[in-house]
Amino acid sequence: MCSLQRKRAKYIFRLDDIAENMDWGNFFLLKELFIKHNVKPIIGVIPNNEDQELLLFPKCPFDFWEEIRSLQRLGWSIALHGFSHKYVTRNSGIFGINKKSEFAGLPYDLQNEKVQKGKLIFEQKRLKIDAFMAPAHSLDHTTLKALVDNEIKTITDGFCLYPY
């Protein structure tokens, strides 16, 4: 006898490029929807934003880090989204998606320094990091070693239909 059970689908919503300079109007629309429907997304926060495209947006008129802390208190997961979000290599890394990276192709000491500095900023701002979210979906095995050495054991990437 075969029994078919209905299983509820589970989804993970992921937002990246969260920084002091970004389109906060769009973000607050999503925030309102997520809160209304009790959705707890993962947000990739850039600790030291130097992304020239994001810097074109005006700096938020409120305490950015308090906003991130309030989201974490709501149960949102916070991911380290690189350090500066500045692409310094043309290495696509493990996934081969984009030919640009903040991390992939750099030596261990530079990658480790970026992870350490990013993590330190979060600690100074009284935030706990739940994961790492690579800018441009590009990281390599050296990035993975730097993450593990800094006690970050979860990465998130949103470019597949199935887990890998």
Predicted regions span which residues?
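Catalytic alpha-helical scaffold of carbohydrate-active enzymes acting on polysaccharides/glycoconjugates
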Residues: 1-131, 138-164
